[in-house]
């Protein structure tokens, strides 16, 4: 499934937001959990699907305010 890709993309955005002082450190896992629970993860995603999931996850992680 695509959960590792979702985790990675959400984590990268959350850390960027933390370093920019937009969120607190303890909000990083909240953003990751939100993305994992809201992005649909196919059981065997294609490369194109993974790229789309990455874009969707980064957008959601940027917009989510824990």
Q: What does each model-found stretch correspond to?
A:
Residues 1-66:
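Catalytic, metal-anchored helix/loop core of enzyme active sites in primary metabolism
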């Amino acid at each position: 499934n695509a959960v590792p890709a979702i985790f990675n993309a959400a984590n990268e955005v959350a850390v960027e937001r933390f370093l920019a002082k937009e969120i607190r450190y303890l909000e990083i896992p909240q953003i990751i959990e939100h993305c994992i629970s809201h992005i649909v993860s196919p059981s065997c995603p294609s490369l194109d699907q993974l790229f789309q999931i990455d874009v969707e996850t980064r957008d959601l992680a940027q917009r989510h305010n824990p």
